[in-house]
Amino acid sequence: SDASRMDFIRFTGEWVVYYVLIALGGGVLVGLTMAVFSAVGVDVAPVVFGWLVPCGAAGAVVVAAALVEAKQSVIENIAPVLTKLFTPLFTAMLLALIVAAVIQANFLLAGRDLLIIFDAVLVVVLGLLLYSISARDPQAKVGWFERLQLVMVSSALVVDALVLAAMLARIGAFGFSANKVAS
């Protein structure tokens, strides 16, 4: 019937929009993960492209369909949904990054590229945190998501301390320069 066809077209259109937005966020996550871990000296490409990307793509299909079925409004509600989707993923990435940095002996002698990539990761974390705080109801009780945000912020502070230690190690090893002092 015509109504069924229109429902199918609506569902498919909304599903494509959600899937593309989730895929773009996943692409940022994969790109930052690959850049950070390669700068630390850990080859995560087999895990990322062998497991993370295929499982993420398959999961995004299901999540996008669930969002459409839940009648989420694409314009008004997508940002809080994406924040709740990517906060756990970025928290896991930060925790794995801390473990990799601790295991790698050469982390304190990291290059500028690594420090710049860490800055990008911290900007994304700040964006996730600020948006979720601004969209949160002040009267709502603290739940699992707020606790997860605390873990994410704590992890980001540890990463920030590691970056600061690496910057100080670079200054100690190579001396002061205008770029090092400015950063």
For each predicted feature, which ranges?
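Membrane-interface helix-loop-helix junctions at boundaries between adjacent transmembrane segments
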Residues: S1-G56, A66-T83
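Juxtamembrane "helix-exit" motif on the non-cytosolic side of transmembrane helices
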Residues: T33-G41, I98-F107, S134-A135, A166-G175
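Phenylalanine-focused residue identity feature
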Residues: F8-F11, F37, F49, V63, ...
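Hydrophobic alpha-helical transmembrane segments in multi-pass integral membrane proteins
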Residues: L24-L32, M93-V102, L157-R170
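Membrane-helix boundary/juxtamembrane motif in polytopic membrane proteins
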Residues: R5-V17, I78-K84, A140-S155, A173-S183
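Alpha-helical transmembrane segments of polytopic membrane proteins
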Residues: P46-G59, R112-V123, N179-S183
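Alpha-helical transmembrane segments in multipass membrane proteins, preferentially the mid-helix core
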Residues: V62-E69, V124-Q139, A156-R170
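Long, well-ordered mid-to-C-terminal structural blocks that present hydrophobic/aromatic surfaces
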Residues: E76-A156
